[in-house]
Amino acid sequence: MNSAPTFMSLYSMPASDSTNETSTINLPATTVKGRNNYDSYGNVDIQENPTDLDAKNLTRFNYTQPTGTFGVGAVQFKNQITFDNDFDFNIRVANNRQSNTTGADGWGFIFSKNDANTYLKDGGILREKGMADAAGFRIDTGYSNKDPLDKTQKQAGQGYRGYATFVKNDAQGNTSKVGSGNPGGSATDPKSDFIYYADNTTNDFDGKFHGQKLNNVNLKYNASNETFTATYAGKTWTATLSQLGLNKKDSYNFLVTSSQHGNGDSGTYADGVMRTDLEGATLTYTPKAQEGTPETTTEKIPYETKREFDPKLAPGTEEVVQKGENGEKTTTTPIYVNPTTGEKVGEGTPTTKVTKDPVDEIVHYGGEKVPQGHKDEFDPNAPKGSKEEVPGKP
């Protein structure tokens, strides 16, 4: 579902590069819903009719991961995000109930200038290291003795012990905690990062948090104070744009990711399936205009006719020795569109190029027919272009 106003203003851009031109086009905020707004990468598929959750067509990560291998998957929003305007993302996720020493690593909600292909190769924000300069919100459900943050959070491989926090990767990809929240603690401490990501309850209506069921994650950004807020499992975390190493001038890809390293580390099969209701996910953001298909127009360039005297031609005759051909010039106008609706919202500076030179038409002509008894004489003293008739003598 895409929402946009019925009427849009059309802008004409001054001469500059396309990045500057699109940045001056102010589009309205819009809300999109559904998995058709995302591209899938890696180990991601659709579970049409889950038997344990009251939902259909769930997006599933880490399914049927071969024994002794790492599972990794991502969905990437089709348009880029900027932080000069507000951002609000809501998605329901259901965690795996496997032990956190062999099950899934968790959920990573990532902002990065790199794309999902780089994520598949380098990793994200759920382990000790991933792709360079990425940042986002991490729900960690998998313990690794190689990850200093897991140790700091006192995850320690105990069943269903997890945590959530904002994190950033440095230029080498090393992942560290930023923003609010105290490492360790308890599930009842609102200032603690600690969560029970799943449990063994058989009562879904006891009022407690059950992470294996579909629960909402809200990730929002307030542009006025440059602060991110994440809400999950009854707790709230915050981090600033600066703490995450992001800035307002750049555009970022937005990824929802999950992975399963425990299966590969243990060398035995372990279930690491993580599921999300991507079909019901909503994202409110302000899109940036994108380059569309340029508009082109052509215009005729008329040919010129040149007349040249040819003494070989009989007086009063003409001959076309080169036929004239019209030329053509093409004007190309950059077009900018709303990436959500495809609607034209602006024009760039037109450029005109001669695509075909005109060919002159050349006409040869003979001299004038001289009457009998008439003689032309050149007078160097006469004004230029003048002609004087002098009567002859009999």
For every predicted segment, state its role:
Residues 4-288:
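Polar, low-complexity loop segments and adjacent catalytic/binding residues used for recognizing
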Residues 289-394:
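Extracellular modular ligand-binding repeats in secreted and cell-surface proteins
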